[in-house]
Regions:
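"…together with the soluble PPM/PP2C metallo-phosphatase catalytic core" -> "…together
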Residues: 2-251
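Membrane-proximal soluble regions of multi-pass membrane proteins
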Residues: 242-269
Length: 269
């Protein structure tokens, strides 16, 4: 366990170091975000700080004991999500490019982990396809939700840490031997890497996650949920409760704007 704790601490330090460098090199890398309607900042602010989260989490994930084929696949899929986000940070990609890639990544995760079958197992076969489509849409919404909320100082990082630590504590208190597996420690590593970034994202934020970090974090949270569901650690209702406040806030906001006849595709504060 001591070795795992060292890896977790290293994830936080690596993330913090990456963000520190990015703040100073953001202009050279084309990673500066001008103030916009949805953001809480009033002057150009570096973005792409989520690269630190990605680096810390991936290095830790590869270093933790118990890494297997599924673990490697999840890390690789997370890297794909992050790379698409990084490209979008530097040169905005249209939704018709981003969403299909994200959908393929999510589909690969659901298929490889067996999560789709676990979630639809109680439904009659005739409903399986419809349930899969709804699940895919919901996951895409969840992944992009983190990007949607990244404009508010600290909120996305705090939510991710809260969800991960809460899930870890629930599993620790109810599942014997849960700390012997890769998934539990990977959740800890992701939380630690997020904390390393949050040091610089705390109000007033010196840097934002950007698409690279926010979409990676949304995907990693979903992957953690799927792995824990398949393993029987946590139930779907428990994860929905953990995500309810964050997802509900953004969803209700968009619904209210839609009912008012506003353009929900246009950013707002």
């Amino acid at each position: 366990m001591t070795g795992n704790l060292v890896i977790i601490a290293a994830a936080a330090v690596l993330s913090c170091a990456c963000v520190f460098v990015l703040i100073r090199r953001a202009a050279q890398l084309g990673l500066v975000q001008a103030p916009e309607a949805r953001s809480s900042h009033v002057r150009p602010t570096p973005t792409g700080g989520g690269i630190g989260i990605v680096a810390g989490a991936l290095v830790a994930g590869l270093s933790l004991p118990g890494t297997d084929g599924i673990s490697f696949l999840i890390l690789a899929l997370g890297l794909v999500i992050a790379l698409v986000g990084l490209i979008d940070d530097r040169r905005p990609l249209p939704a018709r490019v981003r969403l299909p890639v994200q959908a393929l990544v999510v589909a690969a995760l659901l298929w490889s982990t067996g999560a789709a079958g676990a979630l639809a197992g109680g439904l009659p076969p005739v409903f399986h396809l419809g349930a899969a489509v709804l699940l895919l849409i919901g996951v895409l919404w969840w992944i992009n939700l983190f990007n949607f909320m990244d404009g508010i100082d600290g909120i996305a990082g705090q939510q991710a840490i809260l969800m991960l630590l809460s899930a870890m504590l629930i599993a620790f208190g109810t599942v014997p031997g849960v700390t012997g597996g890769w998934t539990w420690w990977m959740m800890a590593a992701t939380a630690a890497a997020t904390f390393g970034f949050l040091v610089f994202n705390w109000p007033p934020a010196r840097i934002f996650m950007g698409d690279a970090g926010s979409t990676f974090l949304g995907f990693t949270l979903f992957a953690s949920a799927m792995l824990s569901l398949v393993a029987g650690w946590l139930s779907l209702p428990q994860w929905l409760v953990l995500a309810a406040l964050f997802a509900g806030d953004a969803t209700v906001t968009l619904l209210v704007r839609l009912l008012r006849g506003e353009n929900v595709a246009q950013a707002h504060r």
